[in-house]
């Protein structure tokens, strides 16, 4: 006879009735069901409360399940009532009440935690706001959750596809890839990324995770409303391989656009995604090229784009980016040839077609600023919030000498993208170029505040100080930039210019020459340095050295094309300074023949040669040709200024002082660009008229004055000659002491000048007197 034992306790009774095992099984089953629900519910469009309901059901069901486990046992014969033990007989109903009480208390606690920390908190959040008319959206590359993977590039590739799809719409502002990488470069966690995005005014952040499973790859995605702190979409995409994941991104992009309320008619052709699905390896190489390009690793980017084209020769997006790379590194002919390999019927979206068409007009080879303005205006009209399109339009205006239109476009970009430091940087840089230093300071300080410790910010502030005449500060700012980024070419050029104007010509020349011989520096910057150094050497009477600098740089200049006529013109003018009229005429004529329209600068250089050589008839023809180029509808009067200066010098030579006065005054006062220091002509006129006081004042101003918007180192030769003219006029006034002081200053400038030049002899004659 089996009598119930009386020596068992409550916990032993739980074990005998298999309550522990039942609780564990219940927990495992609930966990599996909840995990399955998290995958299945989104696929079937289940409402957000469905998952919460499932969790609550399992919590509430726990006490009844444990009571059943206490009461019933599952055997081979099915469910049977668990026999009583001595413990339960002795305790009566109390064990049942205990198990019910404990499980109910546990369930109530968990339920309260879920309710208070999740459901109530969720309900307490602000309701999802309506999507803004033009929301600002950033796309963060999905992260791989399980460490390294052979497909690490895929997150970047997915983000690029989504970014490209959204950028095709007029109804959303998409943060560019390069700009987004700048924003999150210092962030290490998801919270930091979201906080940085929220801090600069981004409305929605799209991010997610990638992980590999035995069946393939899974991509989870989220759209976070950063302002309201809610998640508005969390789709899930899976595929057996990379191609299937990329194909899933097509549908994902549609869901994202729907969530952002992008109108149906604005949905984009899936050109890039379609190509990537069929050419995964080429797309991987293309993504690598973009990453290298962001980091200015041009050779690696070039290799990657060429690899993409080697795999898929009709990958025209990669071809377009390769052409841009060639153009930015000074290989204009190659850039144009690469663009020409993109057929008119290439399978590109309208947006990308316009970028290609605009580049054909914008690139140096066969440049047509008017056509570029037309194409980029259409692009901006279709996509008014796209930063790259607006910046290209502004630069096209700049190339067409429409400075005001260019700056207005940069202002527009800074107004609609106030969160973007590059908009403030571009605006400040162009304002510096036109001498609007006060507004430039505001823009550059805004840029610097958004990018503290940035090398480019220091360099531009150094350029601002340089143009303000604060040379010590300029040197310091450029050195700050180089401490942060030792090879930063903008700061290297700025430091050379600052050192020169501060009076340290030796250090400046060394800096320029180091740029000229540095193959890692982009060709455009090396050419800038060549013209800077040639202008300074010419201004100090070192004509042979100046010619050598230009001659050594001609391979780069010829490859770039744009400044080849300018180089010929500079060489011809220097040979004219040296008295070699034959070579001067040959070079200046070639410069004019190769010049792009309008050839104002090169006609003027020919006119100066004709004046110096006394070729009056040819000079009159050149002046007439300049006047024919004048356009009364344009605000600048470059052609009229140049013609008036040449005609004024000719009248002065013929002693027609009345005509010379009106012509030279107009040359100085009319708005526009000057190809020489026209004010020197006025000083010569006043001297010829016997007004020596006025002549001295004008000559001094010509020797010392600099344009706030342009340092014009090419005019150093005119400043030196104006200084010598000032010294001679002072001597005629009887101010011998001051005349000798200015003569010594000139001779100090020209201490290394080429021998047998007439100017040093004139200065020494003043000292002898």
How would you describe each model-predicted region?
Residues 1-117, 314:
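An N-terminal, helix-rich hydrophobic module
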Residues 282, 316-317, 349-352, 369, ...:
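Helix-start (N-cap) detector for alpha-helical repeat units in TPR-like alpha-solenoids
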Residues 290, 324, 359-360, 395, ...:
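Residue-level recognition of tetratricopeptide repeat
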Residues 294, 328, 363-364, 399, ...:
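Register position in tetratricopeptide repeats
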Residues 91-92, 97-103, 107-130, 156-300, ...:
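Catalytic-center loop of serine/cysteine hydrolases
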